[in-house]
UniProtKB/Swiss-Prot annotation:
Source species: Bos taurus (Bovine)
Record-given protein name: Kelch-like protein 13
KW Cell cycle (keyword) present: yes
SMART domains referenced in this protein's UniProt entry, alphabetically: BACK, BTB, Kelch
Subunit structure: Component of the BCR(KLHL9-KLHL13) E3 ubiquitin ligase complex, at least composed of CUL3, KLHL9, KLHL13 and RBX1. Interacts with AURKB.
Length: 655
């Protein structure tokens, strides 16, 4: 069927071969030739005021200096000469005939062989056609053969929808790769809602991988609009299954996708054989119970096909156990988003020391912060961790208090699929200035402080039971420490014990419920951050005592090798940051906000460390200065609205 195209103008493609502007028979008069030597010993040949594209360079040898000249127009002259010989029927040594007519095309064997591996093998590989004067090319049409021959002799190709398929078929059969590339560009440039299905069919027929990928991308991006056209029902099973399984599919609810798939299945009876395979790509657990009962269970094959029945049972079980969902994740429960972002949460604002409840993500493409659903209550000095792309916020403080007397025990969980929060079981003890890690599907809250003082205790949260239980405590109480996980165990570094900054490193193994001492850091530090990249555990920033009542930023950084049990220094930070958020994004370390003791103020800076280059860079700023902020990475739906940046405030005195 003919394609509907968004332009009726033919595309003229030219191979990058220079065209000589003068007649081949016109001699170059010495009076008009000038050699211009440049400092780099390259030369240009000029004819009057027009450059002729000649160049030269010097080459030294034992025989003396040799000047080598190059003409950039020679290939064009030769090509024009061969084309003229073809048009005049001179020196042609073979005649090609298309498979659908008796038309004859006299050509030169050497030209065809130089442009096509197919013809090269035919004329030099001992095939019977090698000695034939007339060759019939079955499978190549008259239109296609003419286009191929014209291109070989002129380096130009004129394409429109009337000749595209013939040209594509001939180029594929005869292995004329530049023509195939032109056809790919032509197809991609003209894809619309009306012809995307047919373009995809052509791409599959001729194995045009780039075109097929583009059609997939186009259909994904425009799927909601495609659903309102008749073209949707013409999609082949493979492409529809790909679209339904993709995390890049946006702006469609799972119920809309289910209804559309049912329409596609019911168009033709044989399609019902694909019902179970397609339904595996619908994310039934993300539907509401009402949608499942009113719209899904009423469809006959969803009640009779065993696979479909199991899909409904899976959805029902998932929805009945909301606390367990982070450890029940599968392809059918994942968010339909293909973008992971740096996310920040809470913190205390420099202005009036107000605690924030904002949850934000940084849009790397738009270079701006965007707001997600805020917490019900503000938080700083809290712990955050991610299990199954669910964000947990644990403990911390709702009011500004440097002594931890207003610590809380509440725990909330953010679901990016719905941009909503829910409360889960509270800690056994209120705690702030502590560390939280996610390890093997559990949460571990380590140390900290509250109104009763410093804490050595460690609690473990089990999403399967929605309970916190105590595990082995630390040998000494710690607060302001940092932690990370590697190799199935948790590492805790530094912090403050009995008002003394530490440099120790401890390792907790959840399988044995024991703490093990490791090689200490080279520098004491607290309120720092820690993260894992590859097989290295990085310790960054923080502060320590300068005297009895004052503090200094710690700019030095180092990493720990669990395999060698040793520390190695790395490049120092550009600016001091304590009590920060830290996240690893695309193998780079982002240190977010915090407090600078040297400058006596909260900071809005975000610094990035590249482990491969051992370099620090300031990359962007927070919307406002925030201390006690936390950060992570999360796969989310980027919202449309941006976060406004408030005016800068003057630094406050140190807390």
């Amino acid at each position: 069927m003919p394609l509907k195209w968004k332009t009726s103008s033919p595309a003229i493609w030219k191979f990058p071969v220079p065209v000589l502007k003068t007649s081949r028979s016109t001699p170059l008069s010495p009076a008009y030739i000038s050699l211009v030597e440049e400092e780099d010993q390259h030369m240009k040949l000029s004819l009057g005021s027009s450059e002729m594209g000649l160049s030269s360079h010097l080459q030294s040898s034992k025989a003396g200096t040799t000047r080598i000249f190059t003409s950039n127009t020679h290939s064009s002259v030769v090509l024009q000469g061969f084309d003229q010989l073809r048009l005049e029927g001179l020196l042609c040594d073979v005649t090609l005939m298309p498979g659908d007519t008796d038309d004859a095309f006299p050509v030169h064997r050497v030209m065809m062989a130089s442009a096509s591996d197919y013809f090269k093998a035919m004329f030099t590989g001992g095939m019977k056609e090698q000695d034939l004067m007339c060759i019939k090319l079955h499978g190549v049409s008259k239109v296609g053969l003419r286009k191929i021959i014209d291109f070989i002799y002129t380096a130009k190709l004129s394409l429109n929808m009337d000749n595209l398929q013939d040209t594509l078929e001939a180029a594929s059969f005869l292995q004329i790769l530049p023509v195939l590339d032109f056809c790919k560009v032509f197809l991609i440039s003209g894809v619309t809602l009306d012809n995307c299905v047919e373009v995809g069919r052509i791409a599959n027929t001729y194995n045009l991988t780039e075109v097929d990928k583009y059609v997939n991308s186009f259909v994904l991006k425009n799927f909601p609009a495609l659903l309102s056209t008749g073209e949707f029902l013409k999609l082949p099973f493979e492409r529809l299954a790909f679209v339904l399984s993709s995390n890049s599919l946006k702006h469609c609810t799972e119920l809309e996708l289910f209804k559309a798939t049912c329409r596609w299945l019911r168009l033709e009876e044989p399609r019902m054989d694909f019902a179970a395979k397609l339904m595996k790509n619908i994310r039934f657990p993300l539907m509401t119970p009402q949608e499942l009962i009113n719209y899904v269970q009423t469809v006959d094959f969803m009640r009779t096909d065993n696979t479909c029945v199991n899909l409904l049972l899976e959805a029902s079980n998932y929805q009945m156990m909301p606390y367990m969902q982070p450890v029940m994740q599968s392809d059918r429960t994942a968010i339909r988003s293909d973008t992971t972002h740096l996310v920040t949460l809470g913190g205390v604002l420099r202005q009036q020391l107000v605690v924030s409840k904002e949850l934000r993500m940084y849009d790397e493409k738009a270079h701006e912060w965007k707001s997600l659903a805020p917490m019900d209550a503000p938080r700083y000095q809290h712990g955050i961790a991610v299990i199954g792309n669910f964000l947990y916020v644990v403990g911390g403080q709702s009011n500004y208090d440097t002594k931890g007397k207003t610590a809380v025990d509440t725990v909330f969980r953010f679901d990016p699929r719905y941009n909503k929060w829910m409360q889960v079981a509270s800690l056994n003890e209120k705690r702030t200035f502590f560390h939280l890690s996610a390890l093997k599907g559990y949460l571990y809250a380590v140390g900290g402080r509250n109104a009763a003082g410093e804490l050595p205790t460690v609690e473990c949260y089990n999403p399967r039971t929605n309970e916190w239980t105590y595990v082995a405590k630390m040998s000494e109480p710690h607060y302001g420490h940092a932690g990370t996980v590697y190799g199935g165990v948790m590492y805790i570094s530094g912090g403050i014990t009995h008002d003394t900054f530490q440099k120790e490193l401890m390792c907790f193994d959840p399988d044995t419920d024991k703490w093990i001492q490791k090689a200490p850091m080279t520098t004491v530090r607290g309120l720092h951050c820690m993260c894992t990249v590859g097989e290295r555990l990085y310790v960054i920033g923080g502060n320590h005592f300068r005297g009895t009542s004052d503090y200094d930023d710690v700019l030095s950084c180092e990493y720990y090798s669990p395999i060698l049990d040793q520390w190695t220094p790395i490049a120092a930070m550009l600016r001091g940051q304590s009590d920060v958020g830290v996240a690893v994004f695309e193998n780079k370390i982002y240190v977010v906000g915090g407090y600078s003791w040297n400058n006596r103020c909260m900071v809005e800076i975000v610094q990035k460390y590249d482990p491969d280059k051992d370099e620090w860079h300031k990359v962007f700023d927070l919307p406002e200065s925030l201390g006690g902020i936390r950060a992570c990475t999360l796969t989310v739906f980027p919202p449309e609205e941006t976060t406004p940046s408030p005016s800068r405030e003057s630094p406050l005195s140190a807390p």
